[in-house]
Amino acid sequence: MTKDIMDAVFIKEMAKTTSNLYRLGWDERNGGNITYLLDEKEVVEYLDVKQIIRTIPMDFDGKKLAGKYFLVTGSGKYFKNVEEAPAVNLGVIQVSEDGKAVHLLWGYTDGGLPTSELPAHFMSHIARLSVDPENRVVMHCHATHLLAMTFTHELTEREFTRTLWQMCTECLVVFPEGVGIIPWLVPGTNEIGEATSEKMKENRLIVWPHHGIYGAGKSMDETFGLIETAEKAAEVYTIVMSQGGIKQAITDEQLKALGERFGVEAKAGYLNN
C-alpha cells in the first residue's frame, strides 16, 4: 500500500518554494515554473507508476530523459494556489520511452497540463545533467531587480556578471561561473529552450532579457538560493544607482582573494589582471 503523496517531502518542498516565490513578487499571476527531477524510489513510495492517468504529447525530442520522473508546476497555474491545492496545480510525470510524450501519474486534477515552458526546462535538465549528474531542479521566475537590470545595464555576460559580483561579497562564492544571457526570444518555444540549454552547459543562472531568469541546482534550496543571491545583488545595484551611482566597489584584487579563501575560481577572463 502506497503512502499519501501529500506527505511527500518533494510535494512539501515545491509548495513552500512556490509560496515563497509568489510572496517575494517574482511569480505574479501564472508567471514562473519549476521542474523537479525525482528518483524512482521516491515516487514508488507514493504512486503506482504503472497507473497512467493520461499521456500528454510533446513537440520536441525528450528521449535523453526517457523513463525519468518529474514534479512539474502546471500551465496557467498561480503559484499562490499551490500550497492550498497541490493536486490541481502540480503534476508528477514520467517521460515516455520514445521521448515524444509524458505520462501523467498524479495531479492536474482539473485537466491541466505541465508548464508551457516544458521544452526549455527539459532541455536545461539535459544540459545540466551532462555536466552535473546531481542536478535535479530547474526554476524560472521573474526576479524583479534582475529583470529591471536588463533594461538599464549592458547586456554582455562579463559586465553583467561583474556588476553582480561587485554588489555583494557572497556572489562570487555562490556563482563563480557568472551568469549566461540569451537574446530576447518568444517564451514557450523550442528556440528559447535551445538557447537556454546551450548556456546551461556552462552556467546555472541564465538571464532572459526583459522577462526573467532561469536557475538550476542540486536541490530546491540550492536553486532558490542561487536566484535569491543574484536578485539581492541586483536590488543593491538598483539602490546604488538611485543614490547617485557607484563611488567604490569590491575590487578585482579583493575578488581574487575572496575566491582563494573559499576555494572557487572566477570565470576565466572576467577579472582584470
From Swiss-Prot:
Cofactor binding summary note: Binds 1 zinc ion per subunit.
PANTHER family: 3-OXO-TETRONATE 4-PHOSPHATE DECARBOXYLASE-RELATED (PTHR22789:SF0), FUCULOSE PHOSPHATE ALDOLASE (PTHR22789)
Pathway: Carbohydrate degradation; L-rhamnose degradation; glycerone phosphate from L-rhamnose: step 3/3
Binding-site residues for Zn(2+), renumbered to this chain: H140, H142, H211
Protein EC: 4.1.2.19
UniProt KW keywords: Cytoplasm, Lyase, Metal-binding, Rhamnose metabolism, Zinc
HAMAP family membership: RhaD
Organism: Listeria monocytogenes serotype 4b (strain CLIP80459)
GO cellular component, one term: cytosol
Annotated protein name in UniProt: Rhamnulose-1-phosphate aldolase
Subcellular localization: Cytoplasm
Catalytic residue positions: E117
Main location: cytoplasm
